[in-house]
Amino acid sequence: MNVSKINSLVELYFKKKSKVEKKKPFLKWLKPNNNIEYTWEEVTEKIYKLTNQIKIMINEGDRVLLLSENRPEWFIADIAIMNAGGITVPIFTTYAENDYKYILKDCSPSLIIVSNDNQFKKIEKFIENKKIISFETIQNESIPLSVILKKEGKKSVNDKLNRSMPACIIYTSGTSGYPKGVVLSHGGILSNCEGAEELLQPLIKKKKPVFLTWLPLSHSYEHTVQFIQILIGAKIFYAESLEKLILNMNDAKPTIMTAVPRFYQNLFTKISINFQKQVGIKKKLIDQTIKLGKKLLKKKKLSFKEKVINFFCQKLVRKKIQKQFGGNLQAFVSGGGALDQNIGEFLNAIGLPTLQGYGLTEASPVVSCNLPSVVKVDTVGPPFRTNSVKIAEDGEILVRGENVMLGYWNQKEATDNVIKKGWLHTGDIGEIDKNGFLKITDRKKDIIVNHGGD
Protein backbone atom coordinates (compact mmCIF):
# COMPACT_ATOMS: atom_id res chain seq x y z
CA MET A 1 0.00 0.00 0.00
CA ASN A 2 1.36 3.42 -0.97
CA VAL A 3 0.81 5.35 2.27
CA SER A 4 1.87 8.65 0.72
CA LYS A 5 -1.32 8.55 -1.38
CA ILE A 6 -3.67 7.79 1.52
CA ASN A 7 -5.74 10.83 2.57
CA SER A 8 -6.66 9.93 6.14
CA LEU A 9 -6.33 7.38 8.92
CA VAL A 10 -9.92 6.35 8.21
CA GLU A 11 -9.05 5.66 4.57
CA LEU A 12 -6.01 3.68 5.73
CA TYR A 13 -8.24 1.40 7.82
CA PHE A 14 -10.87 0.79 5.14
CA LYS A 15 -8.34 0.27 2.34
CA LYS A 16 -6.48 -2.29 4.43
CA LYS A 17 -9.75 -3.95 5.44
CA SER A 18 -10.60 -4.42 1.75
CA LYS A 19 -7.34 -6.30 1.19
CA VAL A 20 -7.40 -8.73 4.13
CA GLU A 21 -9.49 -11.86 4.61
CA LYS A 22 -12.64 -10.64 6.38
CA LYS A 23 -12.67 -13.64 8.76
CA LYS A 24 -9.03 -13.06 9.74
CA PRO A 25 -8.62 -12.64 13.55
CA PHE A 26 -7.79 -9.03 14.38
CA LEU A 27 -8.38 -7.84 17.96
CA LYS A 28 -8.31 -9.80 21.23
CA TRP A 29 -8.37 -8.58 24.84
CA LEU A 30 -6.48 -10.88 27.21
CA LYS A 31 -8.89 -10.23 30.05
CA PRO A 32 -9.76 -13.16 32.38
CA ASN A 33 -12.91 -15.02 31.32
CA ASN A 34 -12.90 -13.12 28.03
CA ASN A 35 -12.60 -15.39 25.01
CA ILE A 36 -13.89 -12.92 22.45
CA GLU A 37 -11.71 -12.46 19.39
CA TYR A 38 -12.92 -9.99 16.79
CA THR A 39 -12.30 -10.51 13.08
CA TRP A 40 -11.69 -7.65 10.64
CA GLU A 41 -15.30 -8.03 9.47
CA GLU A 42 -16.70 -7.79 13.01
CA VAL A 43 -14.56 -4.78 13.88
CA THR A 44 -15.66 -3.01 10.70
CA GLU A 45 -19.36 -3.63 11.42
CA LYS A 46 -18.94 -2.11 14.89
CA ILE A 47 -17.11 0.91 13.45
CA TYR A 48 -19.97 1.56 10.99
CA LYS A 49 -22.62 1.38 13.72
CA LEU A 50 -20.72 3.51 16.22
CA THR A 51 -19.97 6.05 13.46
CA ASN A 52 -23.70 6.45 12.79
CA GLN A 53 -24.43 7.13 16.46
CA ILE A 54 -21.57 9.61 16.87
CA LYS A 55 -22.69 11.51 13.74
CA ILE A 56 -26.03 12.19 15.44
CA MET A 57 -24.30 13.58 18.52
CA ILE A 58 -21.56 15.84 17.11
CA ASN A 59 -20.81 18.33 14.36
CA GLU A 60 -17.86 18.08 12.01
CA GLY A 61 -14.62 19.10 13.75
CA ASP A 62 -16.00 18.60 17.27
CA ARG A 63 -13.79 17.04 19.91
CA VAL A 64 -14.71 13.66 21.38
CA LEU A 65 -13.07 12.70 24.67
CA LEU A 66 -12.07 9.03 24.94
CA LEU A 67 -11.38 7.67 28.43
CA SER A 68 -10.82 3.93 28.62
CA GLU A 69 -8.32 1.23 29.43
CA ASN A 70 -6.79 -0.61 26.46
CA ARG A 71 -9.38 -2.87 24.85
CA PRO A 72 -10.79 -3.57 21.36
CA GLU A 73 -13.55 -0.97 21.83
CA TRP A 74 -10.89 1.75 22.23
CA PHE A 75 -9.64 1.03 18.72
CA ILE A 76 -13.19 0.85 17.33
CA ALA A 77 -14.13 4.17 18.96
CA ASP A 78 -11.06 5.98 17.66
CA ILE A 79 -11.75 5.03 14.03
CA ALA A 80 -15.48 5.73 14.43
CA ILE A 81 -14.88 9.20 15.90
CA MET A 82 -12.75 10.22 12.91
CA ASN A 83 -15.13 8.56 10.45
CA ALA A 84 -17.94 10.64 11.94
CA GLY A 85 -15.91 13.82 11.37
CA GLY A 86 -14.74 14.27 14.94
CA ILE A 87 -11.34 14.77 16.53
CA THR A 88 -10.32 12.13 19.08
CA VAL A 89 -9.06 13.40 22.44
CA PRO A 90 -7.64 10.31 24.17
CA ILE A 91 -6.76 10.80 27.84
CA PHE A 92 -4.95 8.71 30.42
CA THR A 93 -6.87 6.73 33.01
CA THR A 94 -4.22 7.77 35.58
CA TYR A 95 -4.54 11.55 35.48
CA ALA A 96 -4.98 13.62 38.64
CA GLU A 97 -8.40 15.19 39.19
CA ASN A 98 -7.14 18.68 38.30
CA ASP A 99 -5.81 17.42 34.97
CA TYR A 100 -9.19 15.94 34.03
CA LYS A 101 -10.87 19.21 34.97
CA TYR A 102 -8.41 21.27 32.94
CA ILE A 103 -8.51 19.07 29.82
CA LEU A 104 -12.31 18.96 29.73
CA LYS A 105 -12.44 22.74 29.92
CA ASP A 106 -9.60 23.22 27.44
CA CYS A 107 -10.80 20.95 24.61
CA SER A 108 -14.54 21.40 25.31
CA PRO A 109 -15.70 18.03 23.93
CA SER A 110 -19.19 17.67 22.46
CA LEU A 111 -19.25 13.98 23.34
CA ILE A 112 -17.57 11.78 25.91
CA ILE A 113 -16.87 8.08 25.43
CA VAL A 114 -15.99 6.11 28.56
CA SER A 115 -15.46 2.42 29.14
CA ASN A 116 -17.11 1.82 32.51
CA ASP A 117 -18.18 3.23 35.86
CA ASN A 118 -14.62 3.30 37.22
CA GLN A 119 -13.54 5.68 34.47
CA PHE A 120 -16.77 7.68 34.47
CA LYS A 121 -16.44 8.52 38.18
CA LYS A 122 -13.07 10.19 37.52
CA ILE A 123 -14.70 12.90 35.40
CA GLU A 124 -18.33 12.82 36.57
CA LYS A 125 -18.23 16.13 38.46
CA PHE A 126 -16.79 18.00 35.45
CA ILE A 127 -19.18 16.89 32.69
CA GLU A 128 -22.60 18.29 33.49
CA ASN A 129 -25.00 18.11 30.53
CA LYS A 130 -22.49 16.29 28.33
CA LYS A 131 -23.54 13.55 25.92
CA ILE A 132 -22.03 10.17 26.84
CA ILE A 133 -21.47 6.80 25.18
CA SER A 134 -20.22 3.94 27.35
CA PHE A 135 -18.69 0.59 26.43
CA GLU A 136 -20.39 -0.96 29.45
CA THR A 137 -23.60 0.04 31.24
CA ILE A 138 -22.89 2.81 33.76
CA GLN A 139 -24.92 4.64 36.41
CA ASN A 140 -25.72 7.55 34.15
CA GLU A 141 -27.95 8.42 31.22
CA SER A 142 -25.36 7.26 28.72
CA ILE A 143 -25.93 5.25 25.57
CA PRO A 144 -24.34 1.81 26.03
CA LEU A 145 -22.40 0.41 23.10
CA SER A 146 -24.51 -2.77 23.26
CA VAL A 147 -27.61 -0.72 22.35
CA ILE A 148 -25.80 1.04 19.49
CA LEU A 149 -24.62 -2.26 18.02
CA LYS A 150 -28.20 -3.55 17.75
CA LYS A 151 -29.14 -0.74 15.36
CA GLU A 152 -28.96 -1.01 11.60
CA GLY A 153 -27.80 1.90 9.46
CA LYS A 154 -25.59 3.18 6.67
CA LYS A 155 -22.15 1.75 6.05
CA SER A 156 -20.44 4.99 5.13
CA VAL A 157 -16.78 5.98 4.93
CA ASN A 158 -15.82 9.63 5.39
CA ASP A 159 -14.14 10.76 2.17
CA LYS A 160 -14.00 14.44 3.16
CA LEU A 161 -10.96 13.98 5.40
CA ASN A 162 -7.52 15.02 4.20
CA ARG A 163 -3.97 14.77 5.48
CA SER A 164 -3.81 18.35 6.80
CA MET A 165 -6.87 17.95 9.04
CA PRO A 166 -6.59 17.28 12.80
CA ALA A 167 -6.96 13.60 13.72
CA CYS A 168 -6.44 13.84 17.46
CA ILE A 169 -5.39 16.05 20.35
CA ILE A 170 -2.98 14.28 22.66
CA TYR A 171 -2.31 15.95 25.99
CA THR A 172 1.28 15.76 27.13
CA SER A 173 2.39 16.57 30.65
CA GLY A 174 5.65 18.38 29.84
CA THR A 175 7.58 19.49 32.91
CA SER A 176 5.38 21.98 34.70
CA GLY A 177 1.87 23.39 34.76
CA TYR A 178 -1.13 21.90 33.01
CA PRO A 179 -0.89 19.43 30.10
CA LYS A 180 -0.60 20.87 26.59
CA GLY A 181 -2.90 19.58 23.88
CA VAL A 182 -0.78 18.49 20.92
CA VAL A 183 -2.80 18.56 17.70
CA LEU A 184 -1.67 15.83 15.30
CA SER A 185 -2.87 15.61 11.71
CA HIS A 186 -3.93 12.59 9.68
CA GLY A 187 -0.92 13.16 7.43
CA GLY A 188 1.45 13.48 10.38
CA ILE A 189 0.54 10.05 11.74
CA LEU A 190 0.43 8.52 8.24
CA SER A 191 3.91 9.89 7.63
CA ASN A 192 5.11 8.14 10.79
CA CYS A 193 3.43 4.91 9.66
CA GLU A 194 5.27 5.11 6.36
CA GLY A 195 8.63 5.43 8.12
CA ALA A 196 7.80 2.61 10.52
CA GLU A 197 6.69 0.27 7.72
CA GLU A 198 10.06 0.68 6.01
CA LEU A 199 11.81 -0.07 9.31
CA LEU A 200 9.72 -3.18 10.05
CA GLN A 201 9.65 -4.70 6.54
CA PRO A 202 12.52 -7.17 7.21
CA LEU A 203 10.67 -8.46 10.30
CA ILE A 204 7.26 -8.66 8.62
CA LYS A 205 8.68 -10.81 5.82
CA LYS A 206 9.94 -13.40 8.31
CA LYS A 207 6.78 -13.87 10.37
CA LYS A 208 3.18 -12.70 10.32
CA PRO A 209 3.12 -9.65 12.63
CA VAL A 210 1.55 -10.08 16.06
CA PHE A 211 1.56 -7.23 18.59
CA LEU A 212 0.91 -7.25 22.32
CA THR A 213 -0.29 -3.79 23.34
CA TRP A 214 0.10 -2.68 26.95
CA LEU A 215 1.29 0.94 26.84
CA PRO A 216 -1.80 3.19 27.17
CA LEU A 217 -3.39 3.93 23.81
CA SER A 218 -3.74 7.53 24.97
CA HIS A 219 0.07 7.77 24.79
CA SER A 220 1.17 9.25 21.44
CA TYR A 221 3.61 6.40 20.85
CA GLU A 222 1.06 3.59 21.23
CA HIS A 223 -1.64 5.66 19.55
CA THR A 224 0.43 5.86 16.37
CA VAL A 225 1.48 2.21 16.69
CA GLN A 226 -2.15 1.11 16.28
CA PHE A 227 -2.18 2.61 12.77
CA ILE A 228 1.12 0.91 11.97
CA GLN A 229 -0.59 -2.32 13.07
CA ILE A 230 -3.39 -1.63 10.59
CA LEU A 231 -0.94 -0.88 7.79
CA ILE A 232 0.99 -4.13 8.17
CA GLY A 233 -2.13 -6.24 8.84
CA ALA A 234 -1.07 -7.30 12.32
CA LYS A 235 -3.07 -9.26 14.85
CA ILE A 236 -3.41 -7.21 18.04
CA PHE A 237 -3.63 -8.50 21.60
CA TYR A 238 -4.44 -6.12 24.46
CA ALA A 239 -2.58 -7.03 27.64
CA GLU A 240 -4.48 -7.71 30.84
CA SER A 241 -2.15 -5.56 32.96
CA LEU A 242 1.51 -4.68 33.40
CA GLU A 243 1.77 -7.21 36.22
CA LYS A 244 0.53 -9.99 33.91
CA LEU A 245 2.59 -8.88 30.92
CA ILE A 246 5.02 -11.82 30.82
CA LEU A 247 2.12 -14.29 31.17
CA ASN A 248 0.27 -12.45 28.42
CA MET A 249 3.32 -12.73 26.18
CA ASN A 250 3.09 -16.50 26.45
CA ASP A 251 -0.54 -16.31 25.32
CA ALA A 252 -0.07 -13.78 22.51
CA LYS A 253 3.38 -14.89 21.32
CA PRO A 254 4.11 -11.43 19.86
CA THR A 255 6.59 -10.92 17.04
CA ILE A 256 6.97 -7.19 17.73
CA MET A 257 6.42 -5.29 20.95
CA THR A 258 6.66 -1.58 21.67
CA ALA A 259 7.36 -0.01 25.05
CA VAL A 260 8.95 2.95 26.81
CA PRO A 261 12.41 2.79 28.49
CA ARG A 262 10.96 2.21 31.97
CA PHE A 263 9.72 -1.22 30.86
CA TYR A 264 13.17 -2.20 29.63
CA GLN A 265 14.80 -0.88 32.80
CA ASN A 266 12.50 -3.07 34.90
CA LEU A 267 13.11 -6.03 32.60
CA PHE A 268 16.87 -5.53 32.85
CA THR A 269 16.67 -5.41 36.66
CA LYS A 270 14.58 -8.59 36.93
CA ILE A 271 16.75 -10.60 34.55
CA SER A 272 19.97 -9.32 36.17
CA ILE A 273 18.77 -10.37 39.64
CA ASN A 274 17.96 -13.83 38.30
CA PHE A 275 21.37 -14.11 36.62
CA GLN A 276 23.15 -13.12 39.83
CA LYS A 277 21.54 -16.06 41.64
CA GLN A 278 23.13 -18.55 39.27
CA VAL A 279 26.35 -20.41 40.19
CA GLY A 280 28.87 -22.79 38.61
CA ILE A 281 28.62 -23.67 34.94
CA LYS A 282 25.30 -21.82 34.56
CA LYS A 283 26.89 -18.58 35.74
CA LYS A 284 29.86 -19.02 33.39
CA LEU A 285 27.57 -19.70 30.45
CA ILE A 286 25.47 -16.62 31.22
CA ASP A 287 28.59 -14.44 31.47
CA GLN A 288 29.79 -15.74 28.11
CA THR A 289 26.35 -15.15 26.57
CA ILE A 290 26.49 -11.48 27.55
CA LYS A 291 30.14 -11.04 26.57
CA LEU A 292 29.87 -12.72 23.16
CA GLY A 293 26.45 -11.21 22.47
CA LYS A 294 27.85 -7.70 22.94
CA LYS A 295 30.78 -8.56 20.69
CA LEU A 296 28.44 -9.72 17.92
CA LEU A 297 26.27 -6.63 18.39
CA LYS A 298 29.30 -4.47 17.65
CA LYS A 299 30.02 -6.53 14.51
CA LYS A 300 33.26 -7.95 15.93
CA LYS A 301 34.53 -11.32 14.71
CA LEU A 302 34.52 -14.34 17.01
CA SER A 303 37.41 -16.78 17.22
CA PHE A 304 36.72 -20.45 16.50
CA LYS A 305 36.61 -21.16 20.24
CA GLU A 306 34.21 -18.28 20.83
CA LYS A 307 31.96 -19.52 18.01
CA VAL A 308 31.70 -22.92 19.70
CA ILE A 309 30.92 -21.33 23.08
CA ASN A 310 28.38 -18.99 21.46
CA PHE A 311 26.63 -21.99 19.86
CA PHE A 312 25.92 -23.37 23.34
CA CYS A 313 24.98 -19.90 24.61
CA GLN A 314 22.40 -19.68 21.84
CA LYS A 315 20.93 -23.12 22.54
CA LEU A 316 21.05 -23.12 26.34
CA VAL A 317 20.56 -19.48 27.31
CA ARG A 318 19.15 -17.25 24.57
CA LYS A 319 16.57 -19.77 23.30
CA LYS A 320 15.26 -20.32 26.84
CA ILE A 321 14.98 -16.58 27.44
CA GLN A 322 13.18 -16.09 24.12
CA LYS A 323 10.73 -18.86 25.01
CA GLN A 324 9.75 -16.99 28.19
CA PHE A 325 8.64 -14.11 25.96
CA GLY A 326 6.45 -16.25 23.74
CA GLY A 327 9.18 -17.67 21.51
CA ASN A 328 8.35 -15.57 18.43
CA LEU A 329 9.74 -12.17 19.43
CA GLN A 330 11.70 -10.56 16.61
CA ALA A 331 12.10 -7.12 18.14
CA PHE A 332 11.36 -4.93 21.09
CA VAL A 333 11.05 -1.33 19.91
CA SER A 334 11.88 1.29 22.54
CA GLY A 335 10.53 4.80 22.17
CA GLY A 336 9.17 7.72 24.14
CA GLY A 337 12.45 8.48 25.95
CA ALA A 338 16.13 7.65 26.08
CA LEU A 339 17.11 4.02 26.68
CA ASP A 340 20.29 3.47 28.69
CA GLN A 341 23.05 2.14 26.41
CA ASN A 342 24.03 -0.62 28.86
CA ILE A 343 20.45 -1.88 28.97
CA GLY A 344 20.20 -1.90 25.19
CA GLU A 345 23.46 -3.85 24.86
CA PHE A 346 22.43 -6.32 27.57
CA LEU A 347 19.02 -7.13 26.08
CA ASN A 348 20.39 -7.56 22.57
CA ALA A 349 23.22 -9.75 23.88
CA ILE A 350 20.90 -12.20 25.67
CA GLY A 351 18.69 -12.74 22.63
CA LEU A 352 16.06 -10.02 23.00
CA PRO A 353 16.60 -7.75 19.97
CA THR A 354 15.90 -4.19 21.11
CA LEU A 355 15.70 -1.27 18.70
CA GLN A 356 16.05 2.12 20.32
CA GLY A 357 14.20 5.00 18.73
CA TYR A 358 13.65 8.67 19.46
CA GLY A 359 10.63 10.86 19.30
CA LEU A 360 8.24 13.22 21.01
CA THR A 361 4.50 13.73 20.89
CA GLU A 362 4.99 16.90 18.84
CA ALA A 363 6.50 14.76 16.03
CA SER A 364 3.64 12.22 15.80
CA PRO A 365 5.86 10.90 17.61
CA VAL A 366 8.80 8.96 16.05
CA VAL A 367 11.74 10.83 14.54
CA SER A 368 14.33 8.05 14.21
CA CYS A 369 14.93 4.40 15.08
CA ASN A 370 17.65 1.78 14.87
CA LEU A 371 17.38 -0.76 12.07
CA PRO A 372 16.92 -4.51 12.62
CA SER A 373 20.03 -5.09 10.48
CA VAL A 374 22.20 -2.44 12.15
CA VAL A 375 21.74 -1.79 15.87
CA LYS A 376 23.95 0.94 17.32
CA VAL A 377 22.81 1.13 20.93
CA ASP A 378 24.68 4.36 21.63
CA THR A 379 22.40 6.04 19.07
CA VAL A 380 18.68 6.32 18.34
CA GLY A 381 19.16 5.23 14.76
CA PRO A 382 18.85 7.08 11.45
CA PRO A 383 15.95 9.54 11.00
CA PHE A 384 12.86 8.25 9.24
CA ARG A 385 12.99 9.08 5.54
CA THR A 386 9.67 10.88 5.97
CA ASN A 387 11.14 13.66 8.12
CA SER A 388 14.26 15.85 8.04
CA VAL A 389 16.59 16.29 11.00
CA LYS A 390 19.33 18.85 11.43
CA ILE A 391 21.49 20.06 14.29
CA ALA A 392 21.30 23.77 15.15
CA GLU A 393 24.38 25.84 15.95
CA ASP A 394 23.81 25.34 19.68
CA GLY A 395 23.46 21.57 19.17
CA GLU A 396 19.67 21.40 19.43
CA ILE A 397 17.92 18.72 17.36
CA LEU A 398 15.49 20.25 14.87
CA VAL A 399 12.83 18.28 13.00
CA ARG A 400 10.84 19.19 9.92
CA GLY A 401 8.24 17.19 8.04
CA GLU A 402 4.56 16.35 7.74
CA ASN A 403 4.86 14.55 11.09
CA VAL A 404 5.37 17.84 12.97
CA MET A 405 2.26 18.78 14.96
CA LEU A 406 -0.24 21.35 13.73
CA GLY A 407 0.31 23.13 17.04
CA TYR A 408 -0.71 23.22 20.69
CA TRP A 409 -4.47 23.46 21.16
CA ASN A 410 -5.46 27.02 22.14
CA GLN A 411 -1.78 27.97 22.67
CA LYS A 412 -0.45 29.93 19.69
CA GLU A 413 2.41 31.54 21.61
CA ALA A 414 3.64 28.18 22.92
CA THR A 415 3.39 26.78 19.38
CA ASP A 416 5.40 29.66 17.92
CA ASN A 417 8.08 29.10 20.57
CA VAL A 418 8.79 25.54 19.39
CA ILE A 419 8.02 25.67 15.65
CA LYS A 420 10.14 28.26 13.86
CA LYS A 421 10.30 28.51 10.07
CA GLY A 422 8.81 25.02 9.85
CA TRP A 423 11.39 23.42 12.16
CA LEU A 424 10.30 21.81 15.42
CA HIS A 425 12.75 22.68 18.18
CA THR A 426 12.86 19.50 20.26
CA GLY A 427 14.72 20.81 23.28
CA ASP A 428 17.25 17.98 22.98
CA ILE A 429 20.93 18.29 22.17
CA GLY A 430 22.43 15.79 19.78
CA GLU A 431 24.70 14.95 16.90
CA ILE A 432 24.59 12.90 13.71
CA ASP A 433 27.44 10.43 13.24
CA LYS A 434 29.27 9.65 9.99
CA ASN A 435 26.77 6.86 9.21
CA GLY A 436 23.78 9.18 9.58
CA PHE A 437 22.69 7.82 12.98
CA LEU A 438 21.28 10.33 15.45
CA LYS A 439 22.71 10.47 18.95
CA ILE A 440 21.16 12.27 21.93
CA THR A 441 23.84 13.86 24.10
CA ASP A 442 21.99 16.24 26.41
CA ARG A 443 18.76 18.05 27.03
CA LYS A 444 18.32 21.75 26.42
CA LYS A 445 14.90 22.02 27.97
CA ASP A 446 12.17 19.66 29.09
CA ILE A 447 9.92 19.26 26.06
CA ILE A 448 10.80 15.59 25.52
CA VAL A 449 9.27 12.77 27.54
CA ASN A 450 10.91 10.95 30.42
CA HIS A 451 11.73 7.24 30.80
CA GLY A 452 8.09 6.48 31.41
CA GLY A 453 7.11 8.22 28.21
CA ASP A 454 5.14 10.92 30.04
Feature locations, PLM:
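Conserved pre-ATP/AMP-binding loop-to-beta segment of ANL
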Residues: 23-25, 152-171, 178, 204-210
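Conserved AMP-binding/adenylate-forming core of the ANL superfamily
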Residues: 26-58, 62-71, 75, 79, ...
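Conserved structural elements of the adenylate-forming
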Residues: 44-52, 182-203, 319
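Structural core segment of the AMP-binding/adenylate-forming
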Residues: 56, 83-147
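Conserved AMP-binding/adenylation subdomain of ANL enzymes
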Residues: 190-213, 217-311, 315, 328
